[in-house]
Amino acid sequence: MYYQNVSVGQLIKRVSRFTVEIDLNGTVEPVHMNNTGRNKEILIPGSLASVRYVDNPNRKTHYDLLAVQRQGRWINIDSLAPNHVAKECLEAGTLKLPGLALPYAVHPESTWRDSRLDFAGKAADGQSWFVETKGVTLANGTLAAFPDAPTTRAVKHVHTLTMAQAEGYQAFLLFIVQLPDIRQMTIYRDRFPELVTAITTAKQNGVRVLAYDTMTGPDQITLGNEIPFDEHLPFSEINLNSL
């Protein structure tokens, strides 16, 4: 996935939940951030940041924040990116769902029961499936973790996947880590222990959990390699005083 109309500037500060200030060639611009996470270890003043110009007179801001460079790697924090990447790869067959024959019929944003899941589809052999995608921006070294903030919505989605699996669908929980050079993925138990329990139960009932890292830059994010997932691995956040 490549972005157009991209510029690189310097992050000044986070102003509000959805707004940061970026210095673009000496001009301070308010920039929309499409990510509700805490992102404390990413939004460090002085960091390089990439933004996309949006030509929309009805908007209060003219730019969207795409990625921030931290410790030599670009971290994509566009919360819409994981679904775009997943859709492209599912349709192209470059993201293979274990046990399901290619090609896939892919239908985004499908409602099942009282939940809306990111993707529904059917494999070449007729097996129906669901995929719920979660973007991941929290990491410490080569270990990534989800969530960055408590999320009851994610628990609800996992419960829905578990029910769908019991009714004959093949259900998948897909984590897309929005930065490169990640070797393992876990759930941040200290942040939201209920999610660990929900995922463990889902796996025991046949739900498949997949995790991938990505190749990122100021103007791109593409699917990388599948990485091991273990919801029980311990995780601790980066010490901000060391940054």
From Swiss-Prot:
UniProt-recorded name of the protein: Sugar fermentation stimulation protein homolog
Pfam family, one: SfsA
Record-level Gene Ontology MF annotations: DNA binding
Signal peptide: none
UniProt superkingdom: Bacteria
InterPro entries linked: SfsA (IPR005224), SfsA_C (IPR040452), SfsA_N (IPR041465)
Organism: Lacticaseibacillus paracasei (strain ATCC 334 / BCRC 17002 / CCUG 31169 / CIP 107868 / KCTC 3260 / NRRL B-441) (Lactobacillus paracasei)
UniProt similarity note: Belongs to the SfsA family.
